[in-house]
């Protein structure tokens, strides 16, 4: 769904583990990384869209996670002009997102990025909480910063101890 201003209604998903780390996914066949996200279909609530996208992109279900928080406001970013599909009707100039902070309540072996008909991601890893703000593609950076800032006080209680060692890429 695209609103009257040209923004596609969308959900963004931050999954936290008990160490205060967040799930960071590698886009299929690319070198870019991001949080799971996806569009809201006609007649769908943001929460319903979040659970659908969570299953399609990460293979997790409602019983695998707990909703800790939802962003107070819709957060928007504009697409760079080179990514806008000007021949589409209506034209989508960016994303308008409702963000969800989830706590992983299952073993990470439940993560399976092959459940959807077309995989969005081909790898993932746990990263420190603020890492995505610095690493995401530049046009999404402000939205990530705002969502992460809003969720920070709620995500940090999950953190038990700082984990030593390097981040490990996982295939899923």
UniProtKB/Swiss-Prot annotation:
PROSITE patterns, A to Z: NUDIX (PS51462), NUDIX_BOX (PS00893)
Cofactor: a divalent metal cation
Domain of life of the native organism: Bacteria
Matching InterPro entries: Nudix_hydrolase, NUDIX_hydrolase-like_dom_sf, NUDIX_hydrolase_CS, NUDIX_hydrolase_dom, RppH
Molecular-function annotations in GO: mRNA 5'-diphosphatase activity
Gene Ontology, cellular component aspect: cytoplasm
Keywords: Hydrolase
Domain Nudix hydrolase: 6-149
Zinc recorded as keyword: no
GO biological processes: mRNA catabolic process
Pfam families linked to this entry: NUDIX
EC number: 3.6.1.-
Annotated motif Nudix box, positions: 38-59
Protein family (similarity comment): Belongs to the Nudix hydrolase family. RppH subfamily.
General function of this protein: Accelerates the degradation of transcripts by removing pyrophosphate from the 5'-end of triphosphorylated RNA, leading to a more labile monophosphorylated state that can stimulate subsequent ribonuclease cleavage.
Protein name per the record: RNA pyrophosphohydrolase
Organism: Vibrio atlanticus (strain LGP32) (Vibrio splendidus (strain Mel32))
